[in-house]
Amino acid sequence: MTRATEFSTGGLVRGGALAAIVSGLPSTAWALLTGADPLAAARAAGTLLPRRGERPSLVGGVIVHIGVSAAWTTAFGLAARRWRFGAVRGALAGLAIATLDLCFLGRRFPPIAALPQGAQWADHVAFGAVLGWALRPVPSHALPCSGSWV
């Protein structure tokens, strides 16, 4: 059986959007279970904007989340041209992203560093797993409309 290794830009965008939405579920669920503020992570992300420093902003956090998710989605798209993805490889890539985002960059921003780290790592793994799943090789006979899944 031949597997398609190509994906459409639309498929990449849809996968990235789904991953961006789903990726906040672990930390949100953890916050709700522990009685913490479920929007704290989004507000903390807002401090990554220039001149926001330690002034958390929900709107700023949404903007940062969309931008960072778009950047990592682009990186996944470029990597998927060379390597096959799936949920497991995507989750592993999510761990690599978490290492960069949380261990190297996030610790420089106190509001990010103060977040429950396990939940943040789970968010990154969820992002990678969902996007990896969206970019998985699909059997060519399963692709609609002339081999395109746009």
Language model region names:
Residues M1-V150:
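Short amphipathic, positively biased membrane-proximal segments
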